[in-house]
């Protein structure tokens, strides 16, 4: 599980020094939790193959990443082409999102579906949304409909929905509770995810 050291990594200056620590400290945690999330998805959707990806940030040549993530998708490559699950970390929190970023192929179809859903009835009120995967800001669930409409109108718009865990909770005492909450987050998002995969 993540520790306080995981969050301190984002204070390290320089691309290579930070990436070295991300590879040694954060990516093994992604793999550990990711396998448990993969198992959950495989149990809930047994007829679908899922693949686990870890962001490598290979296109970066100068600036160190301000966050990093892993993803679960039905695609062997190109997970951003479709709605997918992300487990990631910023300097202040860890997140699990159902993500539609970087102009997925069915962006307009996703938007049409999402604007028709009453997410407040499907998800608990502690869920949040993100409108840009490159920024740490999150918004309450009440902002979902507007963001979903924007996803259909603005080509470069994005939408992620899920839960965040503030860094203060990662003190080893709550590890099993947090893991259970992560799995439960996937379970709550599954009905929305399955509808998205049908469009």
Curated annotation (Swiss-Prot):
Signal peptide: none
Domain of life assignment: Bacteria
Gene3D superfamilies assigned to the protein according to its UniProt record, in alphabetical order: Protein of unknown function DUF1054
Family: Belongs to the UPF0637 family.
Name the record gives this protein: UPF0637 protein YsbB
Source organism (scientific name): Lactococcus lactis subsp. lactis (strain IL1403) (Streptococcus lactis)
Organism lineage string: Bacteria, Bacillati, Bacillota, Bacilli, Lactobacillales
